[in-house]
């Protein structure tokens, strides 16, 4: 069985909780369909970003973020009055190290093959990634996340 990994931020009376789910991919083709991306990210427009292998330090411990492809809602900041950072996805995206942009909403993790198709992970790969993400999530409380304001810049031609 092949899996994509879904990162969610759950907001309730106790605050926010980061959730990591292995999602079985029952696709007819080996790639992850655009329809599946829309459904899992709960949106109509997705953005896709490849992230290289990264080393991050939390509390003096080194953590490894494997090379992954992030699939996320392109318009989340425009559709929500009070967007909440998806902290785990934001760390993978480079928040606090490469830039100050948070990701919000559900974020799908997969990998991209040589043809540029989004592909699910094998069960072993998915388990290893979940283990890495769990370790990083244990230290994520050390960071402060500030969601950027939505901005649109119009350019004249």
Language model segments and positions:
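Short beta-rich binding modules
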Residues: 1-157
């Amino acid at each position: 069985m092949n899996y994509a990994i879904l990162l969610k931020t759950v907001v309730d009376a106790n605050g926010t909780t980061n959730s990591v789910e292995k999602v079985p991919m029952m696709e007819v083709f080996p790639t992850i369909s655009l329809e599946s991306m829309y459904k899992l990210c709960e949106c109509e427009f997705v953005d896709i970003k490849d992230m290289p292998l990264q080393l991050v330090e939390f509390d003096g411990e080194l953590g490894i973020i494997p090379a992954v492809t992030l699939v996320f809602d392109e318009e989340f900041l425009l559709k929500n009055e009070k967007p909440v950072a998806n902290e785990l996805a934001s760390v993978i995206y480079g928040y606090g190290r490469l830039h100050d942009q948070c990701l919000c909403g559900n974020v799908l993790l997969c990998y991209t093959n040589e043809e540029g198709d989004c592909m699910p992970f094998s069960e072993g790969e998915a388990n290893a990634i979940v283990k890495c993400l769990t370790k990083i999530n244990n230290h994520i409380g050390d960071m402060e996340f500030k969601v950027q304001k939505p901005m649109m810049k119009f350019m004249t031609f």
